[in-house]
C-alpha cells in the first residue's frame, strides 16, 4: 500500500504533535505488545524485568520510536531509508517480521489513547498505512 502525498502530510503533521511524547508512546506500545502477545517476550529473555515501566522496556520503547522518527524523515523512500535497521533486525537480532505488524498495531492503540482529538479517521488510516510501510521496509532484508 503506497502513501499518497496527503498521507505523508498527515503523518508528518501527526508526528509533529506526538513526537514530544515519543518515549512514552514507545514504552507503552512495547509494554502492550509484551503483555498481549507474550510470544514476543522470547526476544527479550536477557532482560531481568519485562514489566511495564521497567528500565529496559522504557529504553527499548525509546529506541523503537527513534526508528519511527527516522522513518518519518525518510518517508519518501522507506525501503532505502530503513535498510540499516532492516539488516540489523534480519541478520543480528533475527526478529520474526510478523512482530513489526504487532508492534505497529500497539503503537496505533497508544497514539489513539494519548491523542484522541488528533487521531482522526484520516490520521488513523494514514498512520496505519505508514506503519505498514515501515514494517514492509524493515522486512526487506528477510527476502
From Swiss-Prot:
UniProt miscellaneous comment: This fish has two hemoglobins: Hb1 and Hb2. They display the Bohr and root effects.
InterPro entries assigned: Globin (IPR000971), Globin-like_sf (IPR009050), Globin/Proto (IPR012292), Hemoglobin_a-typ (IPR002338), Hemoglobin_oxygen_transport (IPR050056), Hemoglobin_pi (IPR002339)
Positions bearing N-acetylserine: 2
Name of the molecule in the record: Hemoglobin subunit alpha-1
Name of the gene: hba1
Species: Cottoperca gobio (Frogmouth)
Assigned keywords, A-Z: Acetylation, Heme, Iron, Metal-binding, Oxygen transport, Transport
Function: Involved in oxygen transport from gills to the various peripheral tissues.
The organism's place on the tree of life at top rank: Eukaryota
